[in-house]
Design a protein with these regions (language model features):
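Non-catalytic pre-domain segments flanking phosphatase-related domains
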Residues: 1-20, 39-42
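Mg2+-dependent phosphoryl-transfer enzymes with acidic/Ser/Thr/Gly-rich catalytic loops
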Residues: 13-17, 34, 200-284
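Asp-based phosphoryl-transfer active-site loop
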Residues: 16-30
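Active-site phosphate-binding/coordination module
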Residues: 35-136
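Hydrophobic packing residues within well-ordered alpha-helices of enzyme cores
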Residues: 37, 62-66, 177, 181, ...
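Short active-site oxyanion
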Residues: 48-52, 76, 164, 224-225, ...
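Short, structured coil segments at secondary-structure junctions
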Residues: 69, 74, 82, 185-187, ...
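Conserved acidic, metal-coordinating active-site core of Asp-based
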Residues: 111, 115-229, 233-235, 241
């Protein structure tokens, strides 16, 4: 059931910012941007649409996709840490930054160690952690294609502004640890599980749509100028907020329900088809 939308009139392009989730949305199941989708995105960027790669990944884990789309040349942004940071790919400038409260780094790490859960964070090169051989640290390294560096004492090592601490551990223990953390750090941090073995600990109120709102405001635009594509629960606020919220064919039912349009799945150029339809097709 494809929603029928009125075509915009005149030559003023309505969607000036295009926010894309990565895994399950921009990339197929082999984590590749398929040719039709890549061509559509590059054409959109060349028309002046600002492409925002939006993910819970660290900045360093998104950079290869930004390079592949040539956003450093064509213009675009990386929204990392689920909205904790937005950088301009052309200038390298930080446009939005939500810093993890420095005074909570030690308490979170101490709590994690007590429950046999490993904390990690990121620097410009990759992961920083107290146990680089931990299999779940290895999983985060593999997902982002980044190395892990081992340090003796993580809180002592962190001398730069971080955007999140990721806690990794046995999926059997994680629901309990998540619950305890939410009690202990209530009103101080945003805490949720992003995978059975991952607990994200973030500054309060950080999520994709809130950071996109700041970016749009900086550009003198509003949600009506935003098109967003996603597939997972963490994309829900962004899909609801955008003037054109697009759900992938492989999206969870809640995202499909919230979206204005449902496109093909990530194995069949869902993003490319939606960009062709709403951005590249000339207004009639």
């Amino acid at each position: 059931n494809y929603a029928v939308l009125p075509k915009e009139t005149g030559d003023i392009m309505q969607y000036k910012v295009l926010a894309l989730d990565l895994d399950g949305t921009l990339t197929n199941n082999a984590k590749v941007i398929t040719p039709r989708t890549k061509a559509a995105l590059q054409a959109a960027a060349d028309r002046g649409v600002r492409i925002v790669l939006a993910s819970g990944r660290p900045t360093v884990g998104i950079e290869p996709l930004a390079k592949e789309l040539e956003l450093d040349r064509r213009g675009g942004c990386i929204l990392s840490y689920n909205g904790g940071k937005i950088i301009d790919c052309k200038t390298g400038e930080t446009l939005v930054q939500h810093e993890f409260p420095p005074e909570l780094i030690d308490p979170v790490c101490t709590f994690a160690r007590y429950w046999n859960v490993m904390p990690l964070t990121y620097d410009a090169k990759g992961i920083v952690t107290e146990d680089a051989a931990n299999p779940y640290v290895g999983e985060e390294a593999r997902i982002n294609k980044i190395p892990a560096r081992q340090v003796e004492n993580l809180p002592a090592e962190i001398q730069w502004p971080i955007n999140k601490l990721l806690l990794v551990g046995d999926p059997v223990d994680m629901p309990h640890v998540e619950e305890l953390m939410q009690q202990k750090f209530a009103g101080k941090l945003s805490i949720y599980r992003s995978a059975p073995f991952f607990i994200e600990t973030m500054p309060l109120g950080v999520e994709k749509s809130a950071s996109l709102a700041l970016l749009l405001k900086n550009m003198g635009l509003g949600p009506e100028n935003l098109m967003a594509c996603g597939d997972g629960w963490n994309d829900l606020p962004m899909i609801r907020y955008a003037g054109m919220g697009v759900a992938m064919g492989n999206a969870v039912p809640e995202v499909k329900q919230a979206a204005k349009y449902v496109t093909a799945d990530n194995e069949h150029d869902g993003v490319g088809l939606a960009v062709e339809k709403f951005i590249l097709e000339d207004p009639q």
